[in-house]
Amino acid sequence: LTEEASMLTLQFSQNVLKENKAYTLHITDETQLDGLPNTAIAAAAQNAKEQEKEGWIFTLDYPSYSPFMTYSTQRELRKEMYMARNTECTHANDSNNLEICKRLINLRRELAQLLGYSTYADYVLKHRMASNVENVYKLLNDLIDAYKPTAIKEVKEIEELAKEMEGNDFEMQPWDFSFYSHKLQMKKFNLDAEMLRPYFQLDKVIEGVFGLANKLYGITFKENKEIQVYHPDVKAYEVFDKDGSYLAVFYADFFPRKGKQGGAWMTEFQGQWIDHKGNNVRPHVSVVTNFTKPTEEKPALLTLGEVETFLHEFGHSLHGMFANTRFESLSGTNVWWDFVELPSQFMENYAIEKDFLRTFAFHYETGEPLPDELIERIVKSRNFM
């Protein structure tokens, strides 16, 4: 049962990747770029150039999809992008995941019942910090009670702003939400991702994150171009502990490419373990993201959200690099999937720490530091939406 479930889970993911990469929005009319920031336009032009096409190509990868949905004034194109992303693997083709989902549900139910549990959730939660289904429902209901009034208020504000801009007959649709919530955020806080992007040059962010790791844990990173990598975009670093001893190999794989899964994650190519001779075999870990690639005119520039993503996945990589156990199956991130998020969520909190931002957040053209007033606006806007 578990083997079949594993194979179906893998097939599910492969189908999603296939559908994700199959879609592109090819624009040749420059007027259809209205509202988009220069960084998104330049990245789309680069995509088209790499495919030997004229114009601009937008994809369902987050660095392309997110700014399009947030800034594009072309409502019908937003709808097209939204529907493409949110109907993946539901079409009448060989990538449809409906039957896979049905089979997985039945397999999990059968597995749980064979082991004496009422549901698969009961089986899984037996070894999680929540312990049981009742505790999960209690937490969810507590969160709903705490946040629902604010959520209703903010959604109403977004709808009112949209009607103010478009007329009283305007009806909000899912593909409008990012666009108008951004408008409301600008109205409330005068802040958006593109205002911050020039201060978050990827190379500087890397230096800042490595410097933070050195300050907190005493470890150092040294790029080693002799280490074999699996793609030219990937960089490899040797990591050394505070006493100078070898700790790990760290791979940085930051940019989208054909066939690469969307999103961000940390993975291990080699886990830590103690071999039969007593040697401490050190781990090889990788942080994988899909940040906007550099162009001929600009270096890779991140949003604050992407800085936070980097810190989150870097937290996972630290979990892997600091591993020191006998068995590889128990080392690093090979822990229950609720606790595994603790190091990552701890690290991502540094994204809005002033002292951390001051170590690397400088305008890529002028060298000016990120203004304190912008940092204050960031903090104030954190609880919005």
Regions found by a protein language model. Name each.
Residues 309, 313, 317-350:
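Zinc-dependent metallopeptidase catalytic helix centered on the HExxH motif
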Residues 71-89:
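Short, charge-rich amphipathic alpha-helices with coiled-coil/heptad character
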Residues 83-102:
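A short, flexible low-complexity segment enriched in Lys/Arg and Gly/Pro that occurs
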